[in-house]
Amino acid sequence: PLAYMIFRASEAYLNYMEADYMKNKNLDDYSKKYWRALRKRAGVSENFQKTIDATDLSKENDLAVWSGSQMIDKTLYNIRRERRCEFIAEGMRKDDLLRWRSLDKMKNYQTEGFNWQEYQKEPYYVKQLAAGLVVSNSKYLRPHFANELIITNNGYNFEEANYLTPISYD
């Protein structure tokens, strides 16, 4: 592990924008400047307000729409979406979802895979079933239901966000 943390300018911009909006429920001139700079570098329209205005939260299938059991507003959601796009495939998404308490919507949630009744006759899956590697309590495969913690907790469960938790260096 590194002995020091590395922050890119884009990460600092997004952290500032989110904190500014969370604190003031408004974007100051710095936040607007940073947001336009991020979008310009990405090659998309710098007019972030147009994106905010076009957002319909009821049509968004994204956990980041939620903080705990409360739906957030369109501006904060678009800051979160910008963050998701900026850090795609960098392993920051889970930390963000935990920090925002967005995973609360998955408490006691059972993930289901493909339609088990359709595919259970395939030779590969018959072997998996015989080996005890498949758990299915519905017509859909439930691959994680073999995990003892998920069975005990009746699905996924997450701790509530703790904003005083230090940033890990590993």
Residue spans for each PLM region:
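Acidic/polar-rich alpha-helix caps and helix-coil junctions
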Residues: 1-170
